[in-house]
Amino acid sequence: MRIGIDARFYDLSAGIGRYTEKLITHLEKVDNVNDYFIFLTKESFNSYQPQNPKFHKVLANYCWYSFGEQFLFPFKLYRAKLDLFHFLHFNVPLLFFNKFIVTIHDLTQRKLTKRASKLPLLFFYFKKLLYFLVIKNAIKKAKKIIAISSFTKKEIIKYYKIEPEKIIVIYESAE
């Protein structure tokens, strides 16, 4: 099976970057059957050195939450002819229609108010609208959703009316 992983957060020392790094590191140790294509930015491309010959680096120099991510990245993914893609964050391109799973860490952005932002009012609401559009797209189109806690799973079900069976809780581990 040809599996892609969105590792554009790789090389960040905390949060999703650490989750990305540890997931790939541990997958390399346990899976010698599937072929993995690790999509990295230019900044993180040299930081990741595959330790398993079934893992391959792919340059995907599209900034998070950008036009390129939404409208150019999907075409790079289509050219890779993947059987499954794992987005490690909710920012799934709107134009991506192949089979994928998505990890949802939390729904914090959903609850932010203008008071939590220094953005101009119009820009704040435009950004929030895009967030709602992108996360709803990811949740509705995903074959499976990985939630990092039971609380996150309950919130996804509550706000997006998703069948509980579509969501798998996989807790993040401590090292």
Name these PLM-found stretches:
Residues 1-175:
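Carbohydrate transferase catalytic cores enriched for Leloir-type hexosyltransferases
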